[in-house]
């Protein structure tokens, strides 16, 4: 049964317009900007329904809760920022024949997750270390 409510439309729009996989909490916060009464229970229920209807896909990262993205992206991979934990899409294609596998094995599918720092985190000014005064010179210098 497909429900076409304001909440459902808001959740689907948030995921579709994000340009990257979103966590449940990110979907809730962005959805509440459109529908202030949106609850976490409604988000979970709608994510389950949208996944069952093949409108969205869960992005599974080892040891983490699923994130969600639309199904129309085609072949792509993911990049996870080690500083802010956001996940980004990388569009491109790797030939199945170039994926290493043991002899006499056949690769049927694969996931690729790259880890590093996103441009926002690279460009953030570093905060001084706690208890460190950058203007105080050491007598040992």
Question: Model regions: which residues?
Answer:
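Short capping segments at the starts of secondary-structure elements
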Residues: 17-23
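Alpha-helical DNA-recognition elements
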Residues: 33, 49
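Non-DNA-binding regulatory cores of transcription-related proteins
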Residues: 57-58, 62, 66-141
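Glycine-centered, phosphate/nucleic-acid-interacting loop/turn motifs that mediate DNA/RNA or nucleotide
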Residues: 54
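Short, hydrophobic-biased segments on the C-terminal half of alpha helices
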Residues: 44-48
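A short acidic, leucine-rich amphipathic alpha-helix
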Residues: 26-32, 43
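Short alpha-helical segments that sit at the start of domains
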Residues: 1-13
């Amino acid at each position: 049964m497909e429900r076409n409510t304001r909440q459902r439309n808001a959740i689907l729009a948030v995921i579709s317009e994000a340009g990257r996989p979103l966590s449940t909490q990110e979907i809730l916060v962005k959805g509440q900007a459109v529908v202030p009464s949106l609850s976490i229970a409604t988000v979970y229920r709608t994510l389950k329904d949208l996944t069952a209807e093949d409108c969205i896909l869960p992005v599974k990262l080892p040891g983490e809760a699923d994130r969600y993205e639309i199904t129309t992206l085609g072949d792509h991979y993911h990049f996870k920022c080690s500083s802010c934990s956001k996940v980004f899409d990388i569009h491109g294609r790797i030939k199945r024949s170039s994926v290493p596998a043991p002899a006499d094995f056949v690769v049927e599918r694969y996931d690729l997750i790259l880890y590093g720092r996103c441009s926002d985190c690279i460009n953030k000014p570093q905060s001084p270390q706690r208890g460190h005064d950058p203007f105080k010179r050491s007598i040992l210098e």
